[in-house]
Amino acid sequence: MTTIPIFFTFDHHFVLAAGVAFHTLLEKADARYHYNLYVVHTDLKPHHMKRLQHVVGRFPNAEVAFIDASEYDTGWAGLRHKSHFSKEIFYKLTAADLFPQYDRILFSDVDVIFTDDIAPAYFLFPDEKFYYAGTRPIQENNNLPRYRAHFTPEEIQTISQYEISAGFMLINLKLLRADYRQPQLTEFFRRNVDRLILPEQDCIALCLAPDIRFLDYKYVVCAAQYFNDPDQLRYNPNNPLLADRHAAAACYRKMLREVVQLHYPGADKPWNHPLTPRFDLWIRACRHAGLMGYYLQCQPQFLLQRLKRYNLRRFIRKHTGHAQ
């Protein structure tokens, strides 16, 4: 039986989200394949692992393993100006070392639900040279003006053409090892961490272009995108497939119909904020996963996190106002 490996990286705050994501992934899994799920972490406790093992254990063609990545914390601890990044992003760049037993692997965030099988993505680009594959932005990138102060025009152009979402990726581990590209990625990250905007995407684009491939848009669809009018959007000008507005709108509608991974980006998540777009889909998935009791148990923790974020925003606004 062919094995489909996929890894995730998160801390203990995302155990509930991971349980829901894992259950939806395996509900849609193809019975012809065996799915090996890996969790790269540094702070999960045995009871966290047991909960996730219970979810995955319901599916005969799947298993979950946990990789303690503490050895990478030494390098992470020495980085400057990293406070606005989660260290989990660093592990996405070190997959070739973390998984020496595989030639390729999938990666996914856990603030997601899956509505179709991920296996077809694993077999893409069989005869092409590539290091990473992911979805490129379908809408115009509003982050690019932020790059002008820290990146050269040539770097900005490369990022514009080769930026991919780091929320779902296919990674060619065999080629990364053969070409010794992982050390280049991690060294670039260390040297440039103070200027990176979207750290994984920036590193991948600037270090590995043009050997990057693009997945179908259906592999990462953000929940809020369901509330956009496809005929009124500003589309990514770097994608020639979107040059015609009618074709672009048709592509957008097709993406929404065929979504594989539904992503909930941002600080407000469906497990901590019931007004999150497409909350209904996530809470239904939570019930199907048998995790409603855990969802209710976690609410005080999530409320405390929201209060901390709220107080931090008030503090920043207050002191920014005084500075003005």
Annotate each predicted stretch with a short phrase:
Residues 108:
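Catalytic metal- and UDP-sugar-binding loop of GT-A-like glycosyltransferases, i.e.
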Residues 36-43, 134-135:
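Short internal beta-strands
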